[in-house]
Amino acid sequence: MLRYPRINVIVFTDTFFAKKKILTSTRGNTCYQVFMTKHNYITAKPMVSRKSGFPKALTAFFKEEGVPPALVVDGAKEQVKGKSLKLCHQVGCEIRELEQGTPYSNRAEHYVGILKEKVLREMKRTKSPRKLWDYCVEWCTKVLSSIAHEHYQLDGMTLKTKLTGQPTDISNLYEFGWYEWVQFRYDNNQFPEPHEHLGRCLGQAEHAGKVMSQWVMNKNGNVLPIQTLRKLRDDELLCKLNIKEREDFDANIQRRRGTSVSPPKEHVSVEVEPVYE
């Protein structure tokens, strides 16, 4: 199929899982499919389940990054048979199945551990709820692939530029950090209710809102795609009333979403389904 862009590099892929039931994310995701190149470009696509989610994740990768000449997989049935095999045949991508018991031949499998470590480090640093792990995975992969690395094959370029040949746009990444305090505008409120509300930024909102939109969690624990938001000013960070508001915000989120150490005691309903098309 010619509607997909092409990339001239072999891609490795592997699946990593969260702890079942206890740490199913707020969006219902239980695992991620990681795609990686020899230059260490990395991206991850969410999946509700491995069996049904892999063809959708593969389609999303082909649409957003491009079709490689070959895809190296670990030999799981859903990766080498059925819809995935049919899709790869249609787009002209060769599937290379690794021999069983050779995990180090798959670069993606090695890098999954590094990605998990970075996600855990960011969530621990910011004390963000463990239920938000999938948002953090996406934020980490975008940041890792959009900055320069000391790699002799990159020629001073970012990983994404090396992959696609296009300049890397970091406009929607550089301004807000993971789980950073923000004030966002919600215009559904009427006077005398305030238009600005306190929230936590969870990274770029793909497939929702506009290009600059960010996922923002409000005080009720709901995640919304927001375009109009800003960092807290210095006076807001030091004001005692604002400090108390942030403490109340965190206490409410911990009750609804859990902490960086433990998940919530009560079941949390699914909010947002991953969108691919």
What is each model feature region?
Residues 93, 97-153:
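Surface-exposed, charged/polar loop-rich segments
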Residues 156-157:
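Terminal low-complexity regulatory extensions
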Residues 1-115, 161-277:
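Retroviral integrase
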